[in-house]
């Protein structure tokens, strides 16, 4: 997902962020920043060597495979990364709301409320697994080292809860506001992978994964975590899921043999008609539009057996500009007050 300016971009102790992707953007689930699609590498890629040691991303719940997960940003009105944090009681409420429908959630940082979330899942025996994040900033080696160390500690301390670890979020795509050195990212990925038993990945936009240079990164991960937003890429609603399916297939051809998990996709329910987002979003936002996209996406994903994390669980009012219509605030399937939007009303888990 050029992005709406992030006011809180440099806050330390960040957790999630919102995938819907800015300069040291706080680790919250966030839509990928918009960018014009560019061509994939012209030459057919050489398939990677047989990865006999590749770890399998295989979420299970009650002995059955789990296909769909959701990005979880826990911050409510008056809360934000860096504090104040949600209370343990609020986190428990959220997890109880999510558990009937989703068997896995995605976090974007190893700090902030992340351990509270993992501990709550463990102590309350809530059957949700977590893709844990390690937020990698562009020019903060100390913070990055802390994120990596905490991700390793949490993955080893909560092995039943941590399903996988994603090291970095949208750090390589050309439009990223927190673009990181590729060699350092690869080193962080290798450090985490050598220290935990879970499968390891990094998340990025399709406009990185479709480039030849992405193979350097793809070679060191266990699976590819892909972001693709039809809404941010000037698609109309009727073509949103077909566009997303075509995008996934193009990345599959670029990286044959590497499993793909959809890390972020979604549809916003409000936008600021006077904001920068209208340069990239050409389709209407709204609850009925989100409901249609969510229904069509989940149906397609089930038919295609495509694992995914939908973006996102709850609206997050702290994000983006001060304008309450700011699109970054309105990607949740639930309102900030935890009431379901139209996409979930009357729909069985």
List the model feature ranges, each with a label.
Residues 18-19:
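C-terminal motif of bacterial Sec signal peptides marking the signal peptidase cleavage site
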Residues 22-32, 40, 44-64, 77-82, ...:
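Aromatic-rich peripheral "rim/lid" segments of glycoside hydrolase catalytic domains that contact
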Residues 192-210, 258-266, 307-316:
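Aromatic-lined carbohydrate-recognition surfaces of secreted/lumenal glycan-active proteins
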Residues 173, 177, 228-232, 256-290, ...:
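Active-site clefts of carbohydrate-active enzymes
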Residues 132, 163, 169, 204-246, ...:
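Aromatic- and acid-rich polysaccharide-binding/catalytic face
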Residues 65-146:
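N-terminal carbohydrate-binding/catalytic regions of secreted carbohydrate-active enzymes
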Residues 82, 116-201:
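Substrate-binding cleft of extracellular glycoside hydrolase catalytic domains
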Residues 59-65, 95-99, 115-127, 150-162, ...:
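Acidic (Asp/Glu)-rich catalytic clusters
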């Amino acid at each position: 997902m050029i992005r709406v300016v992030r006011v809180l971009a440099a806050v330390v102790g960040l957790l999630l962020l919102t995938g819907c992707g800015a300069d040291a953007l706080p680790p919250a689930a966030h839509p990928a920043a918009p960018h014009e699609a560019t061509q994939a590498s012209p030459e057919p890629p050489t398939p990677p060597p047989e990865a006999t040691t590749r770890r399998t991303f295989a979420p299970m719940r009650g002995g059955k495979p789990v296909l769909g997960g959701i990005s979880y940003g826990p911050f409510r009105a008056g809360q934000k990364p860096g504090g104040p944090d949600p209370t343990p009681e609020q986190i428990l409420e959220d997890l109880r709301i999510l558990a009937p429908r989703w068997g896995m959630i995605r976090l974007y940082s190893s700090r902030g409320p992340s351990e509270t979330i993992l501990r709550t899942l463990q102590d309350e025996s809530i059957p949700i697994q977590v893709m844990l994040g390690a937020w990698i900033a562009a020019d903060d080696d100390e913070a990055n080292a802390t994120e990596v160390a905490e991700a390793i500690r949490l993955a080893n301390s909560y092995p039943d809860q941590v399903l996988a670890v994603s090291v970095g979020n949208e750090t390589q795509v050309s439009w990223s506001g927190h673009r990181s050195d590729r060699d350092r990212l690869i080193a962080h990925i290798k450090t985490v992978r050598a220290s935990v038993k879970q499968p390891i990945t990094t998340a990025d936009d399709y406009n990185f994964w479709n480039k030849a240079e992405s193979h350097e990164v793809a070679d060191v991960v266990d699976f590819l975590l892909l972001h693709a937003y039809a809404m941010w890429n000037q698609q109309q609603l009727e073509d949103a899921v077909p566009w997303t399916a075509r995008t996934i297939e193009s990345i599959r051809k670029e990286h044959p043999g590497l499993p793909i998990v959809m890390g972020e996709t979604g549809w916003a329910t409000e936008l600021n008609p006077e904001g920068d987002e209208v340069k990239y979003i050409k389709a209407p936002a709204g609850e009925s539009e989100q409901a249609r996209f969510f229904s069509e996406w989940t149906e397609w994903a089930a038919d295609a057996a495509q694992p995914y994390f939908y973006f996102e669980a709850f609206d997050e009012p702290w994000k983006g500009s001060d304008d309450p219509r700011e699109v970054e605030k309105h990607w949740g399937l639930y309102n900030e007050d935890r009431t379901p939007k139209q996409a979930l009303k009357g729909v069985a888990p």
